[in-house]
């Protein structure tokens, strides 16, 4: 916040408080684009206001006030910070109250042609292309391996929505994260499958819809 405040020319906290939400988000994102410093990006977080939000998520979890349902929780390899410890703690919390939580890490760096101002790596939200099997709506040079990975993830998420278990009714290898099974399901391409892991042909430009 201090970086954006100084960079945007706010010389007092009072002036910054008077700025519109749109201006603060624009300033933060512009700062990150120009400087390459992603810590300047303004992100929104829930605030306990006693009206819409009565308590923090952490407090609700520790008080066993969360719905008694299975959970799926994960992060991407190049996400916004190290998410693994918090995810592990949440899963153990669910175990302590008799619940289940399935943890995952998405570790497929998205294929790219290295154009300017395009995110690279397994960045935050990059897993959604695979979960919803919407690869065809993106310009990136997907390989057959990407399509195969997307099918695996789509099936797991669909099973979880339908059965509360990403493995489906017949079971599988994705076990809940517990004290005795402290492991994340890892989603990535098979490095041994060179044909499907290498960068494939780009999708025609007329089919490119999103910059990320």
Task: Describe these PLM feature segments.
Residues 1-93:
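Substrate-access "cap/lid" subdomains that shape
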């Amino acid at each position: 916040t201090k970086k954006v405040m100084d960079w945007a020319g706010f010389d007092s906290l009072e002036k910054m408080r008077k700025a519109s939400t749109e201006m603060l988000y624009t300033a933060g994102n512009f700062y990150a684009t120009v400087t390459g410093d992603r810590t300047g990006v303004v992100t929104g977080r829930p605030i306990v206001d006693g009206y819409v939000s009565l308590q923090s998520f952490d407090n609700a979890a520790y008080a066993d006030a969360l719905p008694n349902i299975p959970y799926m929780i994960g992060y991407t390899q190049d996400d916004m910070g190290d998410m693994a410890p918090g995810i592990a703690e949440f899963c153990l919390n669910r175990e302590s109250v008799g619940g289940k939580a399935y943890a995952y890490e998405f570790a497929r760096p998205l294929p790219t042609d290295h154009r300017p101002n395009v995110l690279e790596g397994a960045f935050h939200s990059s897993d959604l292309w695979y979960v919803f099997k919407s690869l065809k709506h993106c310009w990136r040079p997907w390989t057959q391996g990407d399509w195969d990975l997307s099918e695996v993830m789509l099936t797991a998420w669909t099973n979880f929505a339908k059965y509360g278990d990403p493995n489906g009714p017949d079971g599988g290898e994705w076990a809940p994260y517990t004290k005795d099974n402290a492991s994340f399901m890892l989603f990535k391409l098979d490095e041994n499958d060179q044909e499907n892991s290498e960068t494939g042909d780009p999708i025609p430009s007329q089919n490119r819809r999103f910059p990320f």
